[in-house]
Swiss-Prot record:
Record's keyword annotation contains Cytoplasm: yes
Protein name: Uracil-DNA glycosylase
Enzyme Commission no: 3.2.2.27
Entries under HAMAP family matching the protein: UDG (MF_00148)
UniProt cross-references to Gene3D superfamilies, sorted A to Z: Uracil-DNA glycosylase-like domain
NCBIfam families, A to Z: PRK05254.1-1, PRK05254.1-2, PRK05254.1-4, PRK05254.1-5, ung
A single BP term in Gene Ontology: base-excision repair, AP site formation via deaminated base removal
Catalyses which reaction(s): Hydrolyzes single-stranded DNA or mismatched double-stranded DNA and polynucleotides, releasing free uracil
Annotated compartments: Cytoplasm
SUPFAM superfamilies the record matches: Uracil-DNA glycosylase-like
Active site location: D64
Organism: Escherichia coli O81 (strain ED1a)
Gene Ontology molecular function: uracil DNA N-glycosylase activity
The protein's enzyme class: hydrolase
Amino acid sequence: MANELTWHDVLAEEKQQPYFLNTLQTVASERQSGVTIYPPQKDVFNAFRFTALGDVKVVILGQDPYHGPGQAHGLAFSVRPGIATPPSLLNMYKELENTIPGFTRPNHGYLESWARQGVLLLNTVLTVRAGQAHSHASLGWETFTDKVISLINQHREGVVFLLWGSHAQKKGAIIDKQRHHILKAPHPSPLSAHRGFFGCNHFVLANQWLEQRGEKPIDWMPVLPAESE
């Protein structure tokens, strides 16, 4: 069955492609030469570590990792415990407060509990130089993450894709709308949230879709690992 496949099963061949090896080599060379790259090497593929292929129910696409100290840890929009919640995530919390009964904004921005429930928090570019947004945008990461999206499209059924902003929405072309559910809105960034991210109701609509399919809805209240034990 498709849900028994692992990321390793479907990505092993892609990870041997010359472009991918070149991407890894470029990032490794920059780190070795003293350039600060986020996230740390051990965290680059955390989205796949925390959400197994067979568990993917929702995909939230980000662009590239946060480029400030200690922020990025491999999950789109998420920051480590103890790091100030970034503006886009604050706006996501605001939308959750306005639409999910009982949701109260947490005092952290760590979204591992979403990932553990089947929310793939995938940046389309997986590394960035410190302080330089989009500095690794042309390294080949997008070829890899486009492949990831196409593999989810192929091997999973009934996944909700939350595509926020024009960059993410372009990825909609890869997704079969007959097999999956696509929700589009402006990006939650302060620059665009007021143009329709607020009021998009995506978190509610995603759960309604999952429940209609007989699946467990996502608990959107982010909890720190110690709290959930």
